[in-house]
Curated annotation (Swiss-Prot):
The gene is anmK. It catalyses: 1,6-anhydro-N-acetyl-beta-muramate + ATP + H2O = N-acetyl-D-muramate 6-phosphate + ADP + H(+). One of its GO terms (biological process) is peptidoglycan turnover. PANTHER family: ANHYDRO-N-ACETYLMURAMIC ACID KINASE. Pathway: Amino-sugar metabolism; 1,6-anhydro-N-acetylmuramate degradation; Cell wall biogenesis; peptidoglycan recycling. One of its GO terms (molecular function) is ATP binding. The keyword Magnesium does not apply. Pfam families: AnmK. This is Anhydro-N-acetylmuramic acid kinase. Catalyzes the specific phosphorylation of 1,6-anhydro-N-acetylmuramic acid (anhMurNAc) with the simultaneous cleavage of the 1,6-anhydro ring, generating MurNAc-6-P. Is required for the utilization of anhMurNAc either imported from the medium or derived from its own cell wall murein, and thus plays a role in cell wall recycling. It comes from the Bacteria. Keywords: ATP-binding, Carbohydrate metabolism, Kinase, Nucleotide-binding, Transferase.
Amino acid sequence: MPVHDDHCNPNPAPLYLGLMSGTSIDGIDAALVRINANPITHCELIAAQTSAWDPNLRTTLLELSQGQNTASLDQLGWLDAQVGLAFATAANTLIAKTGIKHTQIRAIGSHGQTIRHRPHGDLPFTWQLGDAHRIAELTGITTVADFRRRDVAAGGQGAPLMPAFHLAILGSANENRAVLNLGGIANLTLIPMTGPVLGFDTGPANALLDSWYQRHHHETFDQSGNFAASGKINQKLLACLLDDPWFTLPPPKSTGREQFHLDWMTKQLEPTPPSPADVQATLLELTAVTVADALLRQQPKTTRLLICGGGAHNPVLMARLATHLPNVTVESIQTYGLNPDYLEAMGFAWLAAQTLDGQPSNLPSVTGARGLRLLGAIHPA
């Protein structure tokens, strides 16, 4: 995937590289993008790839993020360094495949790996591992990271952070739109023709679906939703899951594996539980129902729902969303020439550009922060 130099353009739009690993911890997404100068309204994906986690490191991160394990200070320091090394390796691997020089990339935007997200309480916090100093050192590229904590310090949820990016590249003056990221957790961005943008998590998505599937199969996820399609929705289990008070919380709200993990679901199983396929079908329906309910409640006149994330490749989930939203066009962002697997990584490249240009990138209407804030810490090359 060589990238040609801009011989005809002495001032090409700068290149940025975004790095992202979500709540599923199923890989490190790296996206190389070319971003227009301010106002930033267009991002061109130049190259992208997903790097696999070391299996033992992934297991440790999953256990830590789900509250199933505690770690000593030494272990946390080691994990921070390991995640930073893994992110730097993912960046360098992609750069090597493109044939461009590291010096052609203005900055890396790194999300890191969330191990705890506690946006409520007397002293809320969010914590992402991935030593950005190490990323900058090993790549030789200025790295912007730690995007969420400034918003939390300003009274916000620190999530979701993609709505400003979604608005910039997918907003429309002609129809009310929504963007749905179906990653480990499902989150919505509501983009009305006029008025403030809203964004919030709606509940679990691939985090539960993948975990349950992996318990019963050797593969990592339910390819094309076939396992869910082979089962039947268990209405009693679905009602028990929907009874969780988190679902009735109003936005702004965000969540993670510490809230919605496999133990949370298995506690609801009856003494004679449904078949594994029926549970998978029910978990898929949980995602579809909670997304549809949230969308209809918060933006009932939505015309179009654009899907990104791994769930965009699950035709069964896409069909259930369409069933629950009969008056909404439900489609993948691929329709608009965007890769659904790398939109978040592109978004963190965009956040890095915003920060280096001195532009705030949180939306108080989304996170609940006291105002616009410049996000992230800059680690020079």
